[in-house]
Amino acid sequence: MFLVLVVTEELREFLARARNGTGRLIQVLIRDEQLVLGAYREPRHSWDKDYDPVLLPLLDPLEPCYILYRLDSKNAQGYEWLFISWSPDQSPVRQKMLYAATRATVKKEFGGGHVKDEMFGTVEEDICLQGYLRHITSCSAPAPLTVAEQELQRIKITEVKAEISVDPKHQTLQGLAFPLQAEAKRALKQLAERRINYIQLKLDTEKETIDLVHTSPTDIRDLPCRIPLDTPRYHFFLYKHSHEGDYLESVVFIYSMPGYSCSIKERMLYSSCKSRLLDEVERDFHLEVAKKLEIDSGEELTEEYLYDEVHPKQHAHKQAFAKPRGPAGKRGNKRLIKGGGENGGNS
């Protein structure tokens, strides 16, 4: 799923004027897939005295936003700013994804050289004045990161701060984490203990959870029939087989997405939740996933296909600078080459 968001001319011109430091705070919102000006505040006191009274009233518990907050310090380009991504837990998933993916666009439009610090928050405590001071401390010392700072770090690492921009450059959204429901957790534990050999999971897009569909015993020949034709699914399959004389039980993860018969929302959510689900499965349930597959149809899941994916054929390495052997039987008689003397003296 690719998205392109447009920066309105009003916002672009306002950001250009604001860089000279006349304002204290700028709020940016997404409306109708456009980046628009939400609110603007002038400075009244020093940056720290203005901070909570000016910033906190703009935090909607149900809607994300970006906030550019002007500090009183300067660098070579002018006043330094704090860039805040506000994404409350109760806001809709689609909004969270849009704001997460458009972060880099807003920063680029404003001018990254003016931004001194960045923060990510889901509750007021994350980005209030005390939260910012904690953030500064954590950046200057090897102290444990807060949950919000870990989330910001993860966003940077996974490149969700993507080029969804005016240019237009595109990037997929990734990295949401829906919680596993109790039955799904129980099934994963049973798979880790080898008490079952198949799990099918689905996303509940309304409740924003990962739910168990079933754990029916499944052989390789049954596997294609487990892939729905009209909806995405996550599958974990215990692939029992022999390889080079050894009996193996390899966990294979299958993400099935049946073409474009699914809604855009489903495609976005399943794609975005996949990596975080796998991280949790490997970390919390100690399930080592031997192979991760993405398919659009169960027809692909043959025994030969699974074997080749889990054990890809290794290409023989060519010996460096090896001289080719001559044709067999055409080498002629061997010759003895002696030195300058009959007794082997040096020539």
Curated annotation (Swiss-Prot):
Cellular localization per UniProt: Cytoplasm, Cytoskeleton; Cytoplasm, Perinuclear region
GO terms of molecular function: actin filament binding; actin monomer binding
InterPro entries with a match to the protein in the record: ADF-H, ADF-H/Gelsolin-like_dom_sf, Twinfilin
The keyword Repeat belongs to this UniProt entry's keyword annotation: yes
Gene Ontology terms: cellular component: actin filament; cytoplasm; myofibril; perinuclear region of cytoplasm
SUPFAM superfamilies: Actin depolymerizing proteins (SSF55753)
Residue segments, region Disordered: 314-347
Gene Ontology biological process terms from the UniProt entry: actin filament depolymerization; barbed-end actin filament capping; positive regulation of neuron projection development; regulation of lamellipodium assembly
Keyword vocabulary terms for this entry: Actin-binding, Cytoplasm, Cytoskeleton, Repeat
Domain called ADF-H: residue spans: 3-137, 175-311
Compositionally biased tracts (Gly residues): 338-347
Binding partners and assembly: Interacts with G-actin; ADP-actin form and capping protein (CP).
Protein function: Actin-binding protein involved in motile and morphological processes. Inhibits actin polymerization, likely by sequestering G-actin.
Sequence similarity: Belongs to the actin-binding proteins ADF family. Twinfilin subfamily.
Protein name: Twinfilin-2
Organism (species): Danio rerio (Zebrafish)
